[in-house]
From Swiss-Prot:
Amino-acid positions noted as binding Zn(2+) 1 in the UniProt annotation, renumbered to this chain: H78, D140, D196
Gene: pepT
InterPro entries documented for this protein: ArgE/DapE_CS, Bact_exopeptidase_dim_dom, Peptidase_M20, Peptidase_M20_dimer, Peptidase_M20B
Main subcellular location of this protein, as a coarse class: cytoplasm
Broad class of enzyme this protein falls into: hydrolase
List of residues binding Zn(2+) 2: D140, E174, H379
Organism: Escherichia coli O9:H4 (strain HS)
Cellular localisation: Cytoplasm
UniProt keyword list: Aminopeptidase, Cytoplasm, Hydrolase, Metal-binding, Metalloprotease, Protease, Zinc
Protein task: Cleaves the N-terminal amino acid of tripeptides.
Protein name according to UniProt: Peptidase T
Cofactor(s) demanded: Zn(2+)
Amino acid sequence: MDKLLERFLNYVSLDTQSKAGVRQVPSTEGQWKLLHLLKEQLEEMGLINVTLSEKGTLMATLPANVPGDIPAIGFISHVDTSPDCSGKNVNPQIVENYRGGDIALGIGDEVLSPVMFPVLHQLLGQTLITTDGKTLLGADDKAGIAEIMTALAVLQQKNIPHGDIRVAFTPDEEVGKGAKHFDVDAFDARWAYTVDGGGVGELEFENFNAASVNIKIVGNNVHPGTAKGVMVNALSLAARIHAEVPADESPEMTEGYEGFYHLASMKGTVDRADMHYIIRDFDRKQFEARKRKMMEIAKKVGKGLHPDCYIELVIEDSYYNMREKVVEHPHILDIAQQAMRDCDIEPELKPIRGGTDGAQLSFMGLPCPNLFTGGYNYHGKHEFVTLEGMEKAVQVIVRIAELTAQRK
């Protein structure tokens, strides 16, 4: 455990922010730097079959140290950080023995406050690693990486019985490309766990069904003084479209298992407007109904337009709820829950109001629920992680490996 914090601080010092709308994978050069560093560290630790693909997926194996037909299992984290907030020049603050109250983030006005983030009340006495208020921290998912690397070291140093342990570090998870180039056959694990969750005890095997909706609106612009009966304002059409979307089914109005429509971006002029929505729902039937709703809205608003003016809608599915795949293998969850209890942690099964690489991997034949990292408030300058939470994650990973070795 001694090197856990050292590893984490080393990894977050590298800017690995991914970038949307880029064809190449990984989308940024910084991700390659971390991948090459991890490859070097895995080789130094003596892992075998260490490979780094041209698409930036790093894989390695810690060979079994006990005989028998023990299933190979995997642990996976992603190297990129969110495009939503800068990941350059991350300057972590270490707050030992947190005593409550606000934590100043750097020398500006930003604070980490229990008024805004009540979870802090539960973390008294712990060591918090925060940002300086200028960047995100990168615990999502460099905490997961540090935890996997430390767990490998613990398994080796303490000679804990285990089967083959596969590990993988992927790029571009935050822009939805993390699993698209993942070679499940080469990974060769019976099942895996992403280490990409939040607070201690979280175990997630349900996530949103997800789709993106891109709407192109073509209008007609003329001088406003002579516009009657001629102008078709694309911006007005965009406003009408959004007015038809249920206002009480937006991200800021929903929680738990509730789905939503989210207008993520809108831009345009009288001539042309573009809207980008994301649709999310845990229930597959409701998910399909939401997509139909968007098509109906576009058809309604576009009815009667001049042929040269039109509304074009393109819907693309992004990922699906992995629950339907994971529940076919209940022992995967049983082992994780038992491992947590053995580490004095009460498992908290909760839905992911988002997605992980594991969602896509589960539909590619690799059932892959998600384990906690001990981090909070991802994707922004209030992100933080607890050292104690990271240590617990290491213990759970090690215990999962140990329990799996007992399933001969």
